[in-house]
C-alpha cells in the first residue's frame, strides 16, 4: 500500500478482452450459475465491479442477481462503492461501472482488500503485477469511460441506475440464507465475451 504503481492504458486493438464483442446484450445466454435452490435465481458471485465517478475509482467484489437480459441487481454493502453510489444519487446521477470476470489474480486480490480511505485498488494490483511479472498492468478504456484490466476474460459495461429492486434471498459464504433487500440495479449496455464463478462452497472467496 505504501508503494502503489500506475497501470498503463493500452489500445482496444491490443486488449485481449476486446477480441470478441457482441452486437446485442442478453446476459441470460451467459453461463451464470444458479448456485443453491434457496437463491433468488442466477448469480454472478466472483465478478468484480470497477466504478469510476468524479475522478474516483473503486474496485470491489459484489454479488449480482441476474434480473433479466440486461439488468443485474447488485448487493452493495456499506463500503466505498455504496458511498459513491449514494453521493451520485444525491445529485441525480448514475455511476459508470464495468463488471469484470476472471482478471489476473493480482486484481482479484486487490479488489478483496478494504481500506479506510479512497485508494485506487488498481494501483495496488499494478504494483503486485510489476513485482510478479516484471511489467506494468495493462488497462483498456471501455465505451463508458471505465478502465478495466486488458486481459480480463469477460467484461460487461454499463451504469448503476437510480432504480432499486429486490435482491436475495441468497446463500452467503457462511452457508446461511441472506435477507431480501432493496438494492441498486445495474443496466448493462455492452459486453465483450469464458466466465468465472465461485463454486457452491465459495472456497476461493473464503480464502481471500
Give a label for each model feature.
Residues 1-170, 175-185, 189-203:
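Extended, highly charged
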Amino acid at each position: 500500500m505504501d508503494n502503489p504503481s500506475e497501470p498503463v492504458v493500452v489500445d482496444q486493438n491490443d486488449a485481449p478482452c476486446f477480441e470478441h464483442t457482441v452486437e446485442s446484450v442478453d446476459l441470460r445466454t451467459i453461463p451464470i450459475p444458479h448456485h443453491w435452490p434457496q437463491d433468488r435465481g442466477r448469480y454472478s458471485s466472483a465478478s468484480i465491479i470497477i466504478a469510476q465517478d468524479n475522478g474516483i475509482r473503486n474496485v470491489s467484489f459484489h454479488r449480482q442477481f441476474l434480473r433479466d437480459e440486461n439488468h443485474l441487481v447488485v448487493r452493495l454493502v456499506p463500503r466505498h462503492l455504496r458511498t459513491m453510489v449514494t453521493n451520485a444519487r444525491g445529485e441525480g446521477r448514475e455511476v459508470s461501472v464495468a463488471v469484470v470476470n476472471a482478471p489476473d489474480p493480482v486484481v482479484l486480490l486487490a479488489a478483496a482488500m478494504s481500506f479506510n480511505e479512497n485508494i485506487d485498488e488498481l494501483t495496488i494490483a499494478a504494483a503486485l503485477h510489476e513485482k510478479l511479472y516484471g511489467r506494468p498492468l495493462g488497462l483498456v478504456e471501455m465505451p463508458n469511460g471505465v478502465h478495466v484490466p486488458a486481459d480480463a476474460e469477460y467484461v460487461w459495461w454499463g451504469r448503476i441506475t437510480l432504480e432499486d429492486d429486490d435482491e436475495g434471498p441468497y446463500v452467503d459464504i457462511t452457508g446461511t440464507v441472506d435477507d431480501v433487500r432493496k438494492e441498486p440495479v445495474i443496466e448493462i449496455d455492452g459486453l465483450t465475451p469464458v466466465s468465472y464463478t465461485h463454486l457452491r462452497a465459495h472456497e476461493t472467496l473464503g480464502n481471500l
